[in-house]
C-alpha cells in the first residue's frame, strides 16, 4: 500500500508540471477563441453599419410629438455611499409607448425592430424533460467574467420537478437551485440542439437552505435567484448568494402571514474529472440581509413586497470594495399615495406632461420598484449593510428583477428585467430587459434607448391588451411572453428561458442573442447566429479557471476518473489521456 501511495504521489508531481503547461495553454486558447469569435461577429458586412450611425437610433432624445420629453439625466457619478438615488421616471418610461408603432395590425410587433428579440420557433427543444428551468446564471469572478472550471462550463438555474403534481405556474414555491455542466470550448454548431447540458442535480444538500427558517412556521420554503462567485482564480471555492424564501399559505394559496425573503450566503467547492462536475459543501447557510422597512419595503408594509436576486461585484473604481445589487421596493406602507413630481420627471412647461394628481388618481402609487445597493463590511463577504437604492421606479413599475452591473467602454450599465403586467397605470412596456447607463456604480443613471430604459423586449403589440403567459390574449402577439429572465453576459450575449411560445409553455433555455451597446443605446445583432438567434442555452465561458492541484486531486479521488487504477502504469500514458481530454 505504501508503495502504491508513493507511485501516486510521484505521478501527481509529474502531472502537475505537465498540466501547468497544458492547462495554461488551454486557458489562453479558450480566451483567444472567444476573442476571435467576437471579432468575426463584429466584422463589417455589406448593408450593416459597423458602428454608430443608424444602427443605434435609440441615441436620440428628441422626443415624439404628442408625448412628453424624457427626463434629463446627467450620468454623473456620486460617492457610492451617498444617499443619491437616480429615478426611472414616468417621463422616461412613456418613451417606450412613444416609440411603439400605433399603426401595426393587431397582434403584430409594435416595438422598434432593433429593440425586439427575434422570434423563437414553437418547436423549441428542451434542455431536460425531467426538470423545469428558469432563472439562470453563471460562475463568475468579482469582475463578472464567466469561468469554466478545469475544462467544463457550469450554469446554475432555478429548477422544479414537472412530474411532482403541480403546474408550471406553481413552480416558484417549489424552486430549488440546480446546476448543469458541459465541456468548454465547443462552438454551438457542434453541440446538440438543446445546448448539450447535463443536469447535475440540486446544488445544496436537501434541507440545508431550510435551516435559515428553523423554528418558524411555514408551508413552503424555496431557493430563489442570486449569483455564484468563484472566490479565487485557480481555486475551487464558490460562494453562492441567493434568496432564501418561506411562505405560510392556506389551501387557496392566500398568505396566512406575509412571505419572508432573506438574502443568504453559502460556501462550497466545485470539482471535476474526465466525466462530470460535482459540488461539495453548501451545508452552512448564513443570513445576510432582510428588508429593513426604512430603505427597502418589508412584508409588514406590503405582503407583495419584492426583495431578492443578489449580484455581487468589486467596483474597479474602488478596489477591494465589494458591492451587492438586488431587487427591492421603496419602503413605506402599500397603497399610500406619496409619489412626487420628481418621480414623474416631466420637464417644466411640457405640454404633454401628466399632473401629479392625475397620476395619483390612477393608482400608479402601488408600483414602487427599486434597485438596491449594499456594501460588504468584511473580507469573507458574510457581513453587509444597506446603502440607499441606486434607482427607484416609483409610480412606474413594481418589479426590477435580477439587476446586474455591466461595465463597457468605461461606462457602468445596470440591467434588470421586468414584466408588462407590473408597469403602473398609464405607462407600458414589454416583458424584457431594461438598461441604464452612468459614470459610476452610483450615478444619475440615464435610461437607455430614447431615454426609455427598454434594451430588448419580446415581440409585443403595445396597442393590444397584454394577456398573461398562462392565459394569452388571442389578439396579442403569440410571442409576447416567449422569453424572460434575461442575463447580459460578456460580449453582449444575452441568455434567458422560454416561457410561452404560441401557447406552448417552456421551462427550458432560450436561444442566446446578442446586443450591441453604444453609449446610451443598444441594438439586437441580427448577424449573430441565425437571424439573430444563437444556440439554445449557448452560455459560453470567456475565462478559464485552471486549478491544477484540484484537478489532480479530483482525478484520483473519483473512481469514475479511471486514473486511480492506472497509478502503477506508465506516467506518459496517463499524461496523454489528460492532454487528449483537455484539448478536445
Swiss-Prot record:
Induction section of the entry: Constitutively expressed.
Similarity annotation: Belongs to the glycosyl hydrolase 68 family.
GO annotations of cellular component type: extracellular region
pH-dependent activity: Optimum pH is 5.0.
PTM field: The N-terminus is blocked. The N-terminal Gln is cyclized to a pyroglutamic acid.
UniProt keyword annotation of Lyase present: no
Domain of life of the source: Bacteria
Protein name (database record): Levansucrase
Keywords of the record: Carbohydrate metabolism, Disulfide bond, Glycosyltransferase, Pyrrolidone carboxylic acid, Secreted, Signal, Transferase
